[in-house]
Amino acid sequence: YASRGLGDVYKRQMLWMVIICLIGFAVCFMGLQNGIEKISKVMMSALLIIMVILAVHSVMMEGAGEGIRFYLIPDFQKIKEAGVGNVVFAALSQSFFTLSIGIGAMLIFGSYLDKSRSLTGEAVSITVLDTFVALTAGFIIIPACFSYGIQPDAGPSLIFITLPNIFAKMSGGALWGSLFFLFLTFAAVSTIIAVFENLIVFNMELFGWNRKKSVVVCAVLVVILSIPCVLGFNVLSGFQPFGDGSNIMDLEDFIVSNNFLPLGSLGYLLFCTRKNGWGWDNFIAEVNAGTGMKFPKCLKNYVAYGIPAIIIVIYLKGYYDKFAGLGTAALAGWMIVALVLLGFVFYCATAKKKVKQ
């Protein structure tokens, strides 16, 4: 019976993974205006409304004040213990992930913007809204944890273990729990729509496919490649790519967070600022076209040299932190891999080529 129950769990997880993927690709199949734009407007508006309602309810709970203080007042001793550099590194790494910097999502949706509005103003608006959503999510979770005397965790255990326990104890918990996970669903679907559209448009432009063919091919590949993620905590739990306690999701996170995001960002920067690529003059003319906030031209050296240097430090430190505990030989080997990938990005972004304007 136990094995049958576990088998049913795997099947349900697989089913919901396929359903969510199909929903995302169905929206993208309808196109920008009829699909992504219409559905995202409704979904994001509902997401923000639900977030505000949940946050107000959470901060008004008995004992929530302690959680608010924990959330908003920095503990400099903890920062000192963790190391200022590590804290800054973690914050910068999170910015890559939360803003989808480095995987092309911003590039794709930026190409859809009307020329009458400057890209700089839109970028600032996106950053402000993203920060607001992140802060509001904290007001939903942290005060509720302290109200019920539960120390807030991090990662999946916070969402799928700690919070359900809180909702189970809460008056009207079924309602608030349903609203919270509806909010998470909207957030997840909006994210996969952005990622899927990026994949679809990439194939349309690179191979000349129409949208229908690109959607079908990408949908099949994404579903197949997502299967190991679904099975990583159960059937394939014995696969531990980084030693005891690691799983397939850790490998996926390493590939994306430690490689794709920083290296993708670096590639974009080098391409936009180097003469062999798009070039600074073309870049600044594009981002400052239209009305709204303008990107300061005086920041050329910072964008061309300062930010790439910061990204390289983040990238190499990520490898060091990941593999430092494996011994000197293993660390040296992985750092060589990191440098080879870094060199490949520099070559691709700066090699002399004719760029279509």
Give, region by region, the residue ranges found by the protein language model.
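Hydrophobic alpha-helical transmembrane segments of multi-pass membrane proteins
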Residues: 19-26, 89-100, 179-190, 256, ...
